[in-house]
Regions:
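Long, repeat-rich segments with strong aromatic
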Residues: 31-55, 60-64, 185-191, 195, ...
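Short, flexible loop/turn elements at secondary-structure junctions
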Residues: 4, 189-191, 202-204, 273, ...
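Flexible loop/turn segments at secondary-structure boundaries
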Residues: 102-103, 193-195, 206-209, 226-227, ...
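Carbohydrate-active enzyme catalytic cores, enriched for enzymes
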Residues: 48-226, 289-297, 303, 417-419
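Beta-strand-rich N-terminal accessory domains
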Residues: 169-263, 359-369, 425-431
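Active-site-adjacent bridging/hinge elements
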Residues: 19-33, 193-197, 208, 310, ...
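Active-site lining segments of carbohydrate-active enzymes
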Residues: 1-48, 52-61, 140, 155-172
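CBM-like, beta-strand-rich accessory domains located in the C-terminal region of large
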Residues: 240-431
Length: 431
């Protein structure tokens, strides 16, 4: 933008600057946003990136009448739809990696809406405006104010095409972005907080800002989020632990790195499975192998075989909203010929949890749901603390990490004999 502003003062220098900037911007765009529109770093980083991107693109279009091919990139055309579906019915996002769940007003959703003539894209922005959740000091989120609102005035420019009544409700119940580095499938029965929302991811840990969370999922229903992803500790806390213990590099994403010693970054504290207490393979790429769009089974299937570090012969997880009524996960795991597979099936939750005869009972407000696992293998249900010292897998950095007494991990353990196949069907239903 500086090159545009000072072009008349020094045309040669500014022209060289613009040529390099346009070329590097296209390369950078493709590095961040996949061909399917997804950002492998998640929604929080996408918002930061896309707002700067839109300022550049808008400046080029205003000055030269063209964005020099940026908007022709397929991923660019799809990325706003990806973000729309990553926001759950509660107004919180599906989080993975270093992201948090807060969601801000995103002025660029109005830009994309006008550019691609899609009045569904700013759905959550319009909802926030109607509910008075637009805050002068920052964004909107059910838990407080987050990012700066310095770009809000751009809404006046980018939203001018539509009247308020022109924005419409998205109609697709299932959305899939399966070609990116962190593939996702999202299913929802509707768009109100009472409706159900499911998201599941694949991917790998050897990526910027990633966690060992392939196979993780998020589930909302009946006005509450039941399966979540806890907010991580501040970088400074973990960096101090790594430095004081002299145990490596926090930003090394390879297998065995100090990064995976952090309590809330390793696979045991995410809504996925671990086998034989082993970490995931940081290079193991879990791909979405099926997307189901039928009302009777909305969701997707992810192959976790490469993720589980050779501990099993194969592992496939299907997550669906069944008959638009309840959540169902089906994990089909084949043990190696020479060893048992001791599986820990877990997820983080802010609900009150107790073990009952039928499984796990989770309560939030006046709503209670029941988690039950059906399998031929013996099931041991459990509740584990969100405390690096008291968890069943204590953290190497526990003296530096935050202890949270009101958050829990819950799930179950299953032991699969060598060479055997075990199918585990887990449901979460309202009681």
């Amino acid at each position: 933008m500086g090159g545009i502003a000072f072009y008349e003062i020094n045309p040669q220098l500014c022209n060289e600057m613009l040529v390099k900037a346009i070329a590097s911007n296209r390369d950078g765009l493709k590095g961040v946003i996949g061909i399917d529109g997804s950002d492998h770093m998640g929604t929080m980083y996408w918002r930061n990136f896309i707002q700067m991107e839109m300022l550049i693109v808008s400046a080029l279009q205003s000055a030269y009448g063209t964005d020099f091919g940026t908007s022709s990139y397929e991923g660019y055309r799809k990325t706003a739809k990806w973000y729309l579906y990553m926001v759950a019915n509660s107004g919180l996002s599906f989080t993975y990696g270093d992201n948090n769940a807060s969601v801000d007003i995103v002025p660029t959703m109005f830009y994309f809406s006008t550019l691609f003539d899609d009045p569904t894209l700013p759905y959550f922005e319009m909802q926030a405006a109607e509910k008075g959740q637009v805050k002068t000091g920052g964004g909107r989120t059910p838990t407080g104010t987050t990012e700066s609102a310095r770009t809000y005035p751009l809404i006046l420019l980018w939203a001018s095409k539509y009247e308020n009544s022109s924005y419409s409700l998205p109609t697709d119940k299932v959305f899939a972005a399966t070609e990116g580095k962190q593939p996702v499938v999202v299913a929802r029965t509707g768009w109100s907080p009472e409706d159900q929302y499911l998201a599941i991811k694949g991917g790998q840990a050897d990526l910027g800002h990633a966690h060992m969370d392939a196979g993780s999922f998020c589930y909302e229903a009946h006005g509450y989020r039941w399966v979540t992803d806890f907010l991580q500790d501040e970088y400074a806390q973990i960096e101090k632990a790594v430095a004081d213990l002299d145990c490596g590099d926090l930003w090394d994403y390879s297998n065995g790195s100090a990064r995976w010693k952090a309590f809330r970054w390793n696979p045991r504290q995410h809504s996925t499975i671990t086998v034989n207490d082993a970490e995931h393979d940081a290079l193991g790429d879990a791909r979405i192998i099926e997307v189901s769009r039928e009302d009777a089974a909305m969701g997707g299937t992810v192959d976790l075989t490469k993720t589980l570090n050779g501990e099993v012969r194969s592992a496939v997880r299907q997550a669906i909203i069944k008959d638009e009524e309840y959540l169902q996960l089906k994990d089909v795991i084949v043990a190696q010929a020479d060893k048992d597979a001791n599986v820990r099936w877990c997820f983080p939750t802010e609900a009150e949890v107790r073990v009952v005869a039928e499984g796990l009972e989770l309560t939030r407000g006046d709503v209670t749901v029941l988690l039950s696992a059906i399998t031929d293998c013996p099931v041991e249900y459990g509740i584990w603390a969100n405390d690096p010292e008291k968890a069943d897998f204590p953290s190497a950095f526990c003296a530096f990490e935050e202890k949270r007494e009101t958050e829990f991990y819950c799930g179950f353990k299953v032991s699969i004999p060598a060479s055997q196949t075990c199918e585990i069907i887990t449901t979460i239903k309202k009681k």
